[in-house]
Amino acid sequence: MKSNKKILFIGAPGSGKGTISKILVEKYKLVHISTGDLFRKKISEDSRFAAQIQNYLSSGSYVPDEITNKLVADFIKKIPKNQGYILDGYPRTLQQLEFMIKNGINLDCVFYLKIKNETIISRLSQRLFCQKCQKSYNLLLAKPKNGLKCDLDNTDLITRNDDRPEIITHRIEKFNNSVIPIVEFFKKSGIIYYLDAEQTLEETVIEIEKWL
């Protein structure tokens, strides 16, 4: 099954938007546009770029809008117009939203995954990543099958620096402060749907599929 929908997920770190995106990407043949993945790929390919933004990522701060906008826009230009995609982690600021509108990056639906702060901290403290393929796991929600090794390439799994408790708290505050005007904009547009991210990933996916 293929979808040509242009979808945005809004949700705090730990809301499950990345994992849910990957489930839908595989099922509906969508392109997954994750700013986190784009940054990690660019960092691995460009040492000058890595030095430029590493401090932002390790501290849980947002990378300057002009850098993020260019990275996302350059990626979207490569996607065929009739191809559906999921935006995950963008836009995060009003300036990024304005850039989207100005550059004709249109959306069919927006899903806002609402979740309590204590749930976020609990989930992120259990999150692990593969250093080689960047696949993510969660010891609460999506456990690796082989201990603490990646299911795909058997590489040791690690905890990211920005999943430390003190960084998580900062990321939550940053998200809550920046998301309000973005949610309000899409509320007026009539394309936003609110989801309870406290439920299981499977339940959330079933809800989303009603709109696809």
Curated annotation (Swiss-Prot):
InterPro entries: Adenyl_kin_sub (IPR006259), Adenylat/UMP-CMP_kin (IPR000850), Adenylat_kinase_CS (IPR033690), Adenylate_kinase_lid-dom (IPR007862), ADK_active_lid_dom_sf (IPR036193), P-loop_NTPase (IPR027417)
Region (NMP): 34-63
EC identifiers of the protein: 2.7.4.3
Region (LID): 126-163
Primary subcellular site in the record, as a coarse category: cytoplasm
CDD domains tied to this protein: ADK (cd01428)
Intracellular or extracellular location(s): Cytoplasm
Keyword list, A-Z: ATP-binding, Cytoplasm, Kinase, Metal-binding, Nucleotide biosynthesis, Nucleotide-binding, Transferase, Zinc
Swiss-Prot/TrEMBL GO biological process terms: AMP salvage
Top-level enzyme category: transferase
GO terms for cellular component: cytoplasm
Superkingdom of the source species: Bacteria
Pfam families recorded: ADK, ADK_lid
Molecular function (Gene Ontology), one example: ATP binding
The protein's annotated pathway: Purine metabolism; AMP biosynthesis via salvage pathway; AMP from ADP: step 1/1
Binding residue positions for Zn(2+): 130, 133, 150, 153
Domain notes: Consists of three domains, a large central CORE domain and two small peripheral domains, NMPbind and LID, which undergo movements during catalysis. The LID domain closes over the site of phosphoryl transfer upon ATP binding. Assembling and dissambling the active center during each catalytic cycle provides an effective means to prevent ATP hydrolysis. Some bacteria have evolved a zinc-coordinating structure that stabilizes the LID domain.
Subunit structure: Monomer.
Described function: Catalyzes the reversible transfer of the terminal phosphate group between ATP and AMP. Plays an important role in cellular energy homeostasis and in adenine nucleotide metabolism.
Family (UniProt): Belongs to the adenylate kinase family.
UniProt protein name: Adenylate kinase
Gene (UniProt): adk
